[in-house]
């Protein structure tokens, strides 16, 4: 969502900054609830066999939804943007059901608590810091692309990079920093879209998606790190 090309004019804000942030975190929380509920339901029922046979299709479908929402949110209706976000959260829950099937409930609960702490600390930092974090964006994107390529190469040749402590540790740090960056970006988006009620609502949904992705990825890396530690012990 490129807010920099939007003509914001000089109209009065249609919602306060606090209302905007509250809506964003509310949508994010709803998305997480849908994902975790769907992951649990899938892992504990025969749906797990459906996911196993359609894993590639589900993965492609959820990536397509993210791409559509990210690239076309400015031209979509609020209802369509909301449906795309919740649809992605639902599909992602099915894809992530593997973790609920493999890892114990205690590991998942501890990982969720740790993720909430890490995410919360970085979100507070991104909200309160006076430092401009804009410069972090390109560097973090480069790190993310490097991790994706490394993980793909490792999977292709059976090196197992994706589950290593070093790889998971780097991934955890990258998404914690992205949380701070995305949180500050939310405030910048508000300053551009606050005068347009529809655009502000869509920006809130898009912001919820970015924070949702940060939270989910932090959670996954924490789960893997805990799994590695337990296997060694």
Regions flagged by a language model, labelled:
Residues 1-233:
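A hydrophobic alpha-helical transmembrane-helix feature that marks the membrane cores
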């Amino acid at each position: 969502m490129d807010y920099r090309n939007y003509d914001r004019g000089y109209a009065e804000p249609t919602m306060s900054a606090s209302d905007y942030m509250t809506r964003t975190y509310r949508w994010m929380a709803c998305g997480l609830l849908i994902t975790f509920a769907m992951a649990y339901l899938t892992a504990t029922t025969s749906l797990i066999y459906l996911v196993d046979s359609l894993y590639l299709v589900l993965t492609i479908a959820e990536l397509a939804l993210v791409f559509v929402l990210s690239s076309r949110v400015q031209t979509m209706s609020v209802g369509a943007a909301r449906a795309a976000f919740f649809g992605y959260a639902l599909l992602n829950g099915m894809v992530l059901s593997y973790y609920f099937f493999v890892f114990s409930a205690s590991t998942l609960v501890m990982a969720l608590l740790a993720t909430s702490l890490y995410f919360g600390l970085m979100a507070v930092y991104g909200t309160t810091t006076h430092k401009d974090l804009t410069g972090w964006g390109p560097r973090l994107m480069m790190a993310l692309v490097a991790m994706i390529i490394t993980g793909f190469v490792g999977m292709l040749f059976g090196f197992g990079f994706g589950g290593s402590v070093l790889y998971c540790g780097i991934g955890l740090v990258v998404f914690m920093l992205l949380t701070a960056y995305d949180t500050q970006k939310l405030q910048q988006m508000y300053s551009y879209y606050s005068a347009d009620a529809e655009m502000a609502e869509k920006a809130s949904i898009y912001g919820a998606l970015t924070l949702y992705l940060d939270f989910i990825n932090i959670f996954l890396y924490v789960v893997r790190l805990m799994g590695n530690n337990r296997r060694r012990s």
